[in-house]
Design a protein with these regions (language model features):
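Conserved N-terminal beta1-alpha1 strand-loop-helix module at the mouth
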Residues: 1-92, 97-103, 107-116, 129-136
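Histidine/lysine/aspartate-rich catalytic loop segments that bind and position anionic ligands
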Residues: 119-145
Length: 145
């Protein structure tokens, strides 16, 4: 299993990077960040679309840093194998999408060699995360719903 991220750490989002030519940006960011934050969106859980697994596969060989893949998706289990194959080191599904299968999903993430985190939306009570604290390495607290 991947060791937890240092606490605190500085993660750079790649959501606004140049998707056609990530190399210059990634090479520079390798020198100033602790890790990368990569947004995956399915257009259902989040109305937007995020980065795709093929882009992650192209970007990761350029990176010397660990990455946190923020899974803004309705069915996190569907994405785990693809994201692990792409090189993810930390998978962070939303607590709102985990439902009754939270423990199972977090276990599957760890069994695949990744760190496990959860993200929480601003209107979701923190109590929804409390029972997961012993099973996670990271919490991403959203500032937008």
């Amino acid at each position: 299993m991947t060791a937890p991220f240092p606490n605190p750490h500085f993660a750079i989002s790649l959501y606004c990077s140049d998707f056609r030519n990530p190399a210059p940006q990634v090479e520079y960011l390798n020198t100033v960040a602790d890790s990368y934050h990569v947004d995956i969106m399915d257009g259902h859980f989040s109305p937007s679309m995020g980065l795709c697994t093929s882009w992650i596969e192209q970007m990761l060989p350029l990176s010397t840093l660990r990455n946190e893949v923020h899974m803004m998706v309705t069915d996190p289990d569907h994405w785990i194998d693809q994201l692990v194959a792409a090189g993810a080191t930390m998978l962070t599904p939303h607590v709102e999408s985990l439902g009754a299968h939270a423990f199972r999903t977090l276990r599957i993430i760890r069994e695949n060699g990744c760190g496990a985190g959860v993200a929480i939306n601003p209107l979701t009570p923190f109590a929804d995360v409390e029972n997961l604290l012993e099973r996670i390495d990271l919490i991403t607290v959203m500032t937008v719903e």
